[in-house]
Each structure stands twice: as C-alpha cells, then as structure tokens.
C-alpha cells in the first residue's frame, strides 16, 4: 500500500511539474504585436503619389496617413478592389474628408479578422493623376 501511495505522489508531482512548465510557455511567449506603418500623401519631391505606394501588413496593423505635399488629399478604399468586394468594409477603412494642411493625419486599423489579400486605395482629387496605392494584408 505504501508503494502505491508513494508512486501516486511521484506521478502527481511529475504531472504538476509538466503543467507548470507548459503553462510558463504560454505566459512568457511574446505575443505578435500590431505594427503601425506611415504612408505619406504626396511624396517628399512634391509628386502626386502615395509614399510608399505598396505596403504589406498583417491583420491588426494600423496605417497612419500623413498629409505631406500638394494638398488636398484623402484616402478612399475601392469597394470593388478588396478581397471581399465589400462596400461597407471599404467605407470603414476610408477617410473621405480632405486633409488640407501638411502634417494632418488620419489612421486606418485593419481588424484582426480582416480578409487577406490586396486592398486598392486612392486619393479622390488626384486619382486621375495616378495617385493610387495597394495595401496587401497577409493571411
């Protein structure tokens, strides 16, 4: 009987030790933190373009749009050119209000469950001049 009791105690101690070690990995594993990226509206050289024009992000990341040169600018996501072709999603990501002064900022955060793929955006006043860009959300 003492042998069974001692074996049971050792087994319980081993199980508790394993649980403690495994749970410590969950506590000390760094979580993937969201990043913030900056996109300039108008290049430093005064061109009507986004800088950078193409950007790859992960769900949960944020884009900070900074009015740089040759205003006014805004950021509109094309409802026909996002992975889900969802007009409400495009509207929620867009900032249609014109930024008139250099240094003005807006932010767009892609939800943690944002569909992976390419999202096309443009500046309404300068779309005809080619002020268009792409955000690629990784899956």
UniProtKB/Swiss-Prot annotation:
Membrane topology listed for this record: Peripheral membrane protein
Domain Plastocyanin-like as annotated: residue spans: 35-139
Domain of life where this protein originates: Bacteria
Cell location: Cellular thylakoid membrane
Keywords for this protein: Copper, Electron transport, Membrane, Metal-binding, Signal, Thylakoid, Transport
Keyword Chaperone: no
Annotated signal sequence range: 1-34
InterPro entries, alphabetized: BlueCu_1, BlueCu_1_BS, Copper_blue_Plastocyanin, Cupredoxin, Plastocyanin, Plastocyanin_cyanobac
GO molecular function, one term: copper ion binding
Primary residence: membrane
GO CC terms, sorted: plasma membrane-derived thylakoid membrane
Family indicated by similarity: Belongs to the plastocyanin family.
NCBIfam families recorded: cyanin_plasto
Function: Participates in electron transfer between P700 and the cytochrome b6-f complex in photosystem I.
Name under which the protein is recorded: Plastocyanin
